[in-house]
């Protein structure tokens, strides 16, 4: 019998730059069990805002995205707003930050961390 394995496509894009920066931050903390949680909450000037936090625990209903040895966690409520989005890390003259490019956002704020859907 031949087993067929089907790889499930990732619900969002976690770029190499973002994964590299997350790994660097985890290494600085000296806690290899840390994972980066990205979430959406109410607030900001456009209705919703993005947030990032490090956690060790994966919740039962979390979606995980693994890249280059690091794990991104997304809760179900946030996932509905982040499907198809790209999580990136940019280092520029304006500063260094994680950036979310979200095709579901109908408007975004100038700060880049607030949006409406």
From Swiss-Prot:
Positions of iron-sulfur cluster binding: 45, 109, 111
Matches recorded under PROSITE patterns: HESB
Recorded family membership: Belongs to the HesB/IscA family.
Name this protein carries in UniProt: Putative iron-sulfur cluster insertion protein ErpA
Cofactor comment text: Binds 1 iron-sulfur cluster per subunit.
Top-level taxon of origin: Bacteria
Pfam families assigned: Fe-S_biosyn
The species this protein was found in: Methylobacillus flagellatus (strain ATCC 51484 / DSM 6875 / VKM B-1610 / KT)
InterPro entries: FeS_biogenesis, FeS_cluster_insertion, FeS_cluster_insertion_CS, FeS_cluster_insertion_RrpA, HesB-like_dom_sf
BP term (GO), one: iron-sulfur cluster assembly
Cofactor(s) required for function per UniProt: iron-sulfur cluster
Claim: Metal-binding is one of the keywords in the record: yes
